[in-house]
Amino acid sequence: RTALGGRYGTGLRINVSHVRGLDKKMLKENPDELIGTDGYTVSSFGMGDLYYSDIDVEIAKKVSPGFNFTLTYLNQIYNNKVLHGAAGEKPEKIYANIFVYDGKYKLSNKVALRTELQYLHTKQDQGDWIYGMAELSILPSLMLSLSEQYNIGETKKHYVMGSVTYTHGAHRVAFSAGKTRAGMNCSGGVCRVVPETQGFY
């Protein structure tokens, strides 16, 4: 037993992701002159423009039988021009530092509470964001959650969302109400840009 590990131990995880485009050399300055060719050659070991990069460190700690938490730090670079199709005055790349706390509390044999806090710091796009969420699970079927996302950078907008989920056997029914921010939404491997919405879901 150590001071860091304690009675239940401490988990440490480090993940690195780095994605770049191809190192391309165009064969013709005018694309209209290209016939029967891809239009460029590629260096086998060269690297093109940075598309996406992140380094994240995660610490998981069990404090007692009824409480455990995870702390995560992410350093992220996002090519807004390539991945989001941003143009004009929007920044080409977004550099962000993200801090996440995720805590789980076992209140009884049938009731559990999960809380999540996030802080995103960036000088690009809309600036800093904070996020908070509380999720109450009542076994075996009911889950209630309330979340708040707030831009403390440029827009000063609030995005509050509440939801109720009921599960019975193989069936699951969910009802949500609130406001969602505009941006990239990925579902089932398909990503698309969605507008800001408010209503029932």
Model-based region annotation:
Residues 36-43, 82-87, 114-118, 145, ...:
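Extracytoplasmic loops and strand-loop junctions of Gram-negative outer membrane beta-barrel proteins
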Residues 164-171, 195-201:
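Outer-membrane beta-barrel "beta-signal"
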Residues 1-33, 37:
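Long, internal scaffold/assembly segments composed of regular secondary structure
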Residues 49-55, 95-99, 126-130, 156-160, ...:
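Residues that define the transmembrane beta-barrel architecture of outer-membrane proteins
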Residues 16-22, 73-79, 117-123, 138, ...:
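Transmembrane beta-strands of outer-membrane beta-barrel pores
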Residues 23-31, 80-88, 125-132, 148, ...:
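Outer-membrane beta-barrel translocator domains and adjoining extracellular loop/strand segments
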Residues 2, 61, 105, 119, ...:
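Residue-level signature of outer-membrane beta-barrel architecture
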Residues 8-11, 65-71, 109-115, 140-146, ...:
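Repeated loop/turn-to-beta-strand initiation elements of outer-membrane beta-barrel proteins
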